Each structure stands twice: as C-alpha cells, then as structure tokens.
C-alpha cells in the first residue's frame, strides 16, 4: 500500500483543529485530521452539546452542537481527510517528513499541527 502523504496532519478534531483544516484548505494544502473521539467537535460535542456558548464573535449566543456543526462544515469544505477513533502514539522523523503511528496504521505528513485540547476524555456521569 502506498502512503498518502499530506501537507498537514492535524491531531485533534475540536474547534482549533477544525479551523486549522479550514485554513489549510484556504492555502490549498492537503490535510488530514486525526481524532481519538468517534465524532468531530471535541468538547463541544462530547461534553456539552446543549450548552449555550456566549464568547464566539458574531453570535450573541450559540448552542455548542450548532457551533460544532458550523466548524465541521467550514473545516471540511476543502476535502480534508478525517480519521476518527484513532490515537497517535508515536511520531517518527523520516527525512523531510513525519510518520505518525496510530493504532490501525501510520500516516505520512510534511507538517504536524497538534490541536489536542485537553486530550481524549469521556464525560463523568453522576
């Protein structure tokens, strides 16, 4: 199998990672998002999807799940590959590239953007 080399690989599919994917697309860079969670959006979708968010420019308030959906649409509009339920456990330098080692396979990239937020998490049910 031939490796699919990306210009940028983003570790983390929360708000920062999604905006990074958007900006990569604007700059016509190929990209990939790798996230350990089963869906994009980070804490917005995993912890408090029904919470109102008040500190986002352009909105007096917006539900976290709606903000996440907007960010997902914006971040993936240029065709960024998305890999979910995958954790990067190792980074290896290979010449002028990096190999990111995950549970299921490895990924070659020219640049890494780490946007892991607080890392993998699960909500605690009381």
Task: Report residues per predicted region.
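FAD-binding core/adjacent interface of flavoenzyme oxidoreductases
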Residues: 1-11, 27, 82-126
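Glycine-rich FAD pyrophosphate-binding loop
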Residues: 9-11, 25-46
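Flexible, glycine-rich phosphate/dinucleotide-binding loops
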Residues: 17, 40, 62, 91, ...
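Alpha/beta-hydrolase active-site loop signature
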Residues: 38, 51, 120
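N-terminal Rossmann-like dinucleotide/flavin-binding domain of flavoprotein oxidoreductases
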Residues: 45-106
